[in-house]
Amino acid sequence: MKEAETARPVFGRRDPDARGYFGAYGGRFVPETLVAPIEELTAGYYAARKDEAFCEELDRLLKHYVGRPTPLYEARNLAGAGKAGRAGEAGRVGGVRSDPAGVRVFLKREDLTHTGAHKINNALGQALLARRMGKRRVVAETGAGQHGVATATACALLGLECRVYMGTEDMRRQALNVVRMHLLGATVHGVDAGSRTLKDAINEAMRDWVANVTDTYYLLGSALGPHPYPLMVREFQSVIGREARAQILEQAGRLPDLVVACVGGGSNAIGIFDGFLDDKAVRLIGVEAGGEKIAPGRHAARFAGGSTGVLQGTRTFVLQDEAGNIELTHSISAGLDYAAVGPEHAWLRDLGRTEYAHISDAEALDGFKALARLEGILPALESSHAIAYTMQLIPTLKPGSIVLVNLSGRGDKDVQTVIDSGGRVLSDPADRR
């Protein structure tokens, strides 16, 4: 695989319509005060992606700063445990080796990027855009903290002032990332409104942007919000799918049968899906947060319990009551704990091109444990949803099937949450026989 062919985005392949819609979803639902800044951003982005110097700098930084391309790793032990139907019992001495004729599982290792997650791909691209547009100050929201860390990292590199908004509940469960942001020079502002999670952080970041539009750039972290954000984020994240497609052809000799990724706003998923959208035989499966159960306020599975609505600038699938009030959400994973999904995901689902499932908190913890004890990899709790779903899926697949999973981030940030979950993950499997 030639690195020069995979690091830089291929812009302009799947643009929304002139109003920013993917089918019935997307658009721009913003107050009058944001119309001019959004138009400035749109013009700035379309100009930047045609600028060879901008593209070359992004390409160079993705390779030599972020560490792209990230590896594609075959998880043989995980595949064997999934075949045996033992996700909840993973970790017994000696591991489980897969049958060579059985299902093969490959992990796209976004956890190995600089900062430890896929978020840096988008943060770096948008930070370069902010500098190109003459903005000296960047504001961002964060849930799991990885986007905040990535934004603070990019701003430190490019000499930009950085302010990150984060719900106080997320600050509690992602305390390590709060410290990392401070160390990188960012100001972290706790948001104590509403559910004190990602939705509320986005509200505050957008208020800041409205009040400081002249010198401030809003660096949105997922494939949602008003146009052009869903397009920009997908294009900056499309490097994942483009690399993964070339790597799986090289290692396995053919395309995968399934591509699986967790879905909060949906940036890591849309990034890897983008490399396979034209390959109709490849199933694309997004995994949402099933939380405690599918009931109002107990989960964040928009396609399981949501309906079409508008939230924070975009029309998409939203968790809301009959009156259109946004429902509270819950997930053990801060990065999936959000009431809406990116509009392109909603459109692709309507087209029948993508499928969506959900995994509970308990199942995600089992996925976390399985990957740690079978492969020696600590996944983010977000990614653990995709791992857990894959292990449930393996026994249903034909021998020789290939599953590609996007391992969107590493789990260092989630250790305290895992500790707080009690003995489910930390106890020795032998003690529970």
What are these regions (language model features)?
Residues E3-G26, E32-K135:
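Positively charged, low-complexity intrinsically disordered leader regions
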Residues G27, P71, L107, K119, ...:
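Buried hydrophobic positions in well-ordered alpha/beta secondary-structure cores of metabolic enzymes
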Residues A81, G125-K135, V149-E161, L183, ...:
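Alpha-helix C-terminal capping segments
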Residues H114, N122, A130-G167, L255-N268, ...:
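A short, small-residue-rich loop immediately preceding and capping a beta-strand
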Residues V139, H147-A205, I294-G306, D414-S421:
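Active-site-proximal loop->helix
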Residues K199-D208, D215, L220, L224-V282:
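Glycine-rich ThDP/TPP pyrophosphate-binding loop and its adjacent helix/strand module
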Residues I202-P228, M232, A281, G286-I377, ...:
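Active-site/ligand-binding loops adjacent to catalytic centers
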Residues V263, S267, D361-G422:
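Claisen-condensing/thiolase-fold acyl-transfer catalytic domains that form or cleave C-C bonds
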